[in-house]
Amino acid sequence: MDAPIGIFDSGIGGLTIAKALVERLPRESLYYVGDTAHMPYGDKSPERLNEYASGIAQRLTQAGCKALVVACNSASSNALGAVRNVAGPKVPVIGVVEPVVHWAQSHHPKGILSLIGTRATVQSGVYQRVTTK
């Protein structure tokens, strides 16, 4: 069997991404981690988010995952670099911020978009940085 794609979130919200992957990539196997022990991530410091996300990334890479999806806005906004460091250069790491911004800009090119997010996501400023690229 081929190596799985690892997905993690602070709870079960990332299951929507897992469902989309199953629909689009039906032959791929998935390894899902919902970190309910530390949820919610939205009220955690960037340092704590880096710690949690790095630990999960280590678990997923040790399980042989060929790619990682950080399906949590708070973790994607604050800990994507830490996850990439743990995963190493051979394991692609995908967060949710850039795909969301790309979708929003392609579907609403002239619109004003608002973000409703956790404190950790909003305070990271990542959506502002990505939309001004």
Language model features: what each stretch is:
Residues 1-133:
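Non-catalytic structural scaffold of enzyme domains
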